[in-house]
Swiss-Prot record:
GO terms for molecular function: ATP binding; protein serine/threonine kinase activity; transmembrane receptor protein tyrosine kinase activity. Keywords: ATP-binding, Cell membrane, Glycoprotein, Kinase, Membrane, Nucleotide-binding, Serine/threonine-protein kinase, Signal, Transferase, Transmembrane, Transmembrane helix. Its EC number is 2.7.11.-. ATP binds at residues 488-496, 510. Gene3D superfamilies: Galactose-binding lectin, Phosphorylase Kinase, domain 1, Transferase(Phosphotransferase) domain 1. It is an enzyme of class 2 (transferase). Glycans are attached at residues 40, 216, 279, 380. This is Probable receptor-like protein kinase At5g59700. Residues 25-406 are extracellular. It comes from Arabidopsis thaliana. Residues 482-755 form the Protein kinase domain. Residues 428-829 are cytoplasmic. It comes from the Eukaryota.
Amino acid sequence: MGGEKFGFLIWILSIPCLIFLCYGYVPVDNYLINCGSSTNVTVTSRVFISDNLASNFLTSPNEILAASNRNSNSDIYQTARIFTGISKYRFSVARGRHWIRLHFNPFQYQNFQMVSAKFSVSSETHVLLSDFTVSSRVMKEYSLNVATDHLELTFTPSGDSFAFLNALEVVSVPDTLFSGDPSFAGSPGKFQGLSWQALETVYRVNMGGPRVTPSNDTLSRIWEPDSEFLVEKNLVKSVSKIASVDYVPGFATEETAPRTVYGTCTEMNSADNPSSNFNVTWDFDVDPGFQYFLRFHFCDIVSKALNQLYFNLYVDSMDVVENLDLSSYLSNTLSGAYAMDFVTGSAKLTKRIRVSIGRSSVHTDYPTAILNGLEIMKMNNSKSQLSIGTFLPSGSSSTTKKNVGMIIGLTIGSLLALVVLGGFFVLYKKRGRDQDGNSKTWIPLSSNGTTSSSNGTTLASIASNSSYRIPLVAVKEATNSFDENRAIGVGGFGKVYKGELHDGTKVAVKRANPKSQQGLAEFRTEIEMLSQFRHRHLVSLIGYCDENNEMILVYEYMENGTLKSHLYGSGLLSLSWKQRLEICIGSARGLHYLHTGDAKPVIHRDVKSANILLDENLMAKVADFGLSKTGPEIDQTHVSTAVKGSFGYLDPEYFRRQQLTEKSDVYSFGVVMFEVLCARPVIDPTLTREMVNLAEWAMKWQKKGQLEHIIDPSLRGKIRPDSLRKFGETGEKCLADYGVDRPSMGDVLWNLEYALQLQEAVVDGDPEDSTNMIGELPLRFNDYNHGDTSVNFSVAKEGRFDEEESSVDDSSGVSMSKVFSQLIKSEGR
């Protein structure tokens, strides 16, 4: 009986293969299961077999089949299988890519209310869903590259909850569908290793056309219309010429996208006003913290001849392709189907991907642009996750794997023991050398300063001095056990509390949130950086605590909070223009000090108004060094590193090239300058499209010479024109597209001092002289590190904790303005 049942199953599974023959692609594996059902169901010519026939694929501690949702318009959503314990599906498959489609439609069955179900789904290599809940019908589609002869899917209920599934698809994917190395969106280079990435389909969109159902797609995909994603629907028109589509050999095929997608498009509606200059934009909400694979589908169905369509393609306002001529890609074929692949990491910093098309600025005879289709797929992170949550897979429980592991362990156990013993010996010798050499290697610390700890986070011996360590009991006493009434802020690292130490010192206590994406690396960097610095314009670190796996940083308390809170959103009194200039000058001094250290320069990497704090006298201090990076070696121009920072302040060149320099801080500081001037957020999605990004908005008015039109209303009529002009010119230079064109922080500092002097009094000579740009400054003032040492003493060595030098500037508090007044007046020399 069992043989007959299995033979029938094979026959059933062969039916879809016969159907696919008429489309050209025959999947090697094609498992379609109607979970919870005792009968087969045909959906759009595909047969989903009953749960009874699929029982050979499932290992589950309980057999609960639910069937009560008779209101569903699709048979596969009328039943479900409920898992009350860890359950596994195991399929024999050919190696290669496979679609995994999980169908969910919650309903109530007996005591099981499926909307309250919470569970995780994982393969042997990737986490697909973590702590997943579902309130309405949804289909989750994944593409996994299977490297073995089987695929295992595990359903794990969270806590006392349960899991459920309405239908399951495991179907082969053509090997050529995801191949090659896609380009990075907006930056040079290519992403290598796409073939082994796990992908989750987030959006699959048919631009300008209707919804495409599985019956009209050779790979049974669903394509949604683009209308709900368009930002301005009145700027476009839909075009449909399905019969014109030409699949050119060697390029896109019907497996890439169906004819219905390539035969329709969304086109710029520029016919009424061909001279108008606008972009067509689509916005897509995504999960932050991941890279995304983007596939653009193009087919020129709007031109009457070759070389009549040139346009630009943008992703998150970055140029991806300029002057795109589709016919040049397709061997001079009109209406040829073509796909372009990119990888973007911009979603790591935001919850949205913005895609735009716009007319070419070079080929203006044909002012239009098109897009036929778009696919957006989430890529697994470094932890092989496609969903971030608390779930951690325990690994395969296969008996075979355990046996193999045991055999290997017994075989090489003695060898490993020798290696471990040898390793201990090497570490012991190295530790002795490091201690003799006063190394900064990070090692565990105990509360008494020794190098062993059972409960401490792995940290470093900070400059061989444990005086920075503060006991947890002292921190709790200072904050009244982290009383929420003492909370004064919250950030990416965790909450900040106001506290007071035994000696009466007021402190700000930053306590890490265990769920924060910032962790040990940022904690370590903050301590390492701030323990080296002593400067009046950098926030001082008082100590840290790492007991009981806590990560706590204790700083000097800044009475007036963040610069951001004094600009907008808090209802505080408005700052005067002089106060704002002095705050900018103080911040610039702090950054200049970081960039021009005695050893390697330090790049802050997260300059923003929220990281500039103000003391009781409104003196500015730069804070938050968790993302800071030591600058390049003397013979190098940059540091290659993963992009980190805050959206809106991020240097676009750093984002494109992933090459960090001091000029990245200069760009961010330029954004802060315009934020100070305009008193508005750097990104404000509530405003019109052209005003959303402050840097772009301010640069537009600065280049017009009309910056006064967008300044903080409370400052109108209170800023001298020449002071505003110098401030605007300086900010404009900071926001140059390329770092080489930006000034150093020393140049910025000099010009800000100049702007302050222009505000306070008219300098000798013609005030129009103040219009000179940064690049036109006398050579003497272009770089504080190379000028006349008799002039530069208060800047070039500003603030390093050196007894002889600190008396000159840092400790004495000599105003830069006094020195500056000698620089700009001829009689001062």
